[in-house]
Amino acid sequence: MAQFFKAAPTNSIKNHILKNIKVEKLDHRGRGLAYFQNKPLFIDGALAGELLEVQIVESKKRYSKGKIKKIIKASELRITAACPHYQECGGCDLQHLNQAAQIQIKSDGLLSLFQRFAKKVPQQLEKPIIDKAWEYRRTARFGLQFDKKNKQLKMGLRRAQSNELIDQKVCPVLLPELECLIPPLKILLNSLQCKAHLGHVELLYADQGAVVLLRHMKTLTSPDLQLITAFSALQKVNFFGQASSNQSVCLAGEANLSYRLPEWDCSLSFTPTDFLQVNSDINKKMVSQAMQWLALEKNDSVLDLFCGLGNFTLPIARQVESVVGIEGVQQMVDRATANAQLNNLQNARFYQADLSGENLIEQEWANQNFNKVLLDPARAGALDCLAFIAQKKPSHILYVSCDPLTLARDSQVLLDKGYKLDKLGLLDMFPQTAHMESMALFTG
């Protein structure tokens, strides 16, 4: 059979330098938007109104991407980034703006997406939920790369759009209790006999203090364990190891971890591999706002989808007659059930279900009458379970989202089913980045 090959285009503009490019506005991801050859040109780190010299790094049929080579005319909003790694690190992308400007960009982006994907858009957003702009992250994962030539282990976040690690020295968005561990942790990891067989290291913070989780592909030796024990005692951290399985093992320090939601007198146990909201202060405010927007009453029966450890479920249980939490992973269901027992909440029950499946109505819990629903899905959204939710005809549907694009898309479905978008608001869960958390209330 004859084979035909299409020659690569000879007019590719990749790596070309463009001068006097004017940025028109920012998109919902905080990227500068300009136009070149009648198609969008997205520029990381650019601000509206700026005049730039830009290098094309990617050219597609419908759009191009560029990076700033020189700022010819800077925006009045541009500030100097606080982190010395900002120009090379892929972790943050809005440090060149103050917090108020970041909030405005995210708010504008959220409204813009709803204007594109939803029929009815609120005239304005609810007051945004904000807190500290720095020193807020209670979780972080650092990559580890072993250099065979110099026998050294590099620890750091990845460069933007790259698998290469930076040589991390500081990270000012981390809680101070975690950031201060970066230098001594690098020394420890480079002292281990198994340093050529490490995957990544995670830092997190619990009520029991700082936690280190080390992913290792080779069994830790006795000398390695001794070094880890000494490090744990000196730095006052809880140290966990994770081999090939997903199970983590406490190597030194406190094995039982938890965090509190004091407003509702709830304590939630977790393991280092469980999902946690990265911003503890915003998380507490988020739970509080969710409870207010749902207008919970004592006789309510609430369904909490994508419930995780019970971050929303347990506080809700303090206010209502009954609440059912649904999660896709059985281990998380077991953890949430244990958390309900720990908090002496008899009116909270948890079940495992594939929330992307089509047979939700056949589940044993699905025949209950729920008058209010809360859902907090991953970035992919909750498109597959919206028909089931609407079928239950709840008076309130509260949707918490970490991706405004899928929230706007899913909102269209609920609006088409007769629900009204009653409230829409931004939660600044991730300052210094373009990522946003948002909350929408639908009533019917």
UniProtKB/Swiss-Prot annotation:
The family database entries (CDD domains) matched by this protein are listed as: AdoMet_MTases
Keyword Iron-sulfur found: yes
Which amino acids does the record list as binding S-adenosyl-L-methionine?
A: Q277, F306, N311, E327, D354, D376
Q: What's in the keyword line of the UniProt record?
A: 4Fe-4S, Iron, Iron-sulfur, Metal-binding, Methyltransferase, rRNA processing, S-adenosyl-L-methionine, Transferase
Binding sites annotated in the UniProt record for [4Fe-4S] cluster: C83, C89, C92, C171
Q: Which HAMAP family match?
A: 23SrRNA_methyltr_RlmD
- Name-wise, this protein is 23S rRNA (uracil(1939)-C(5))-methyltransferase RlmD
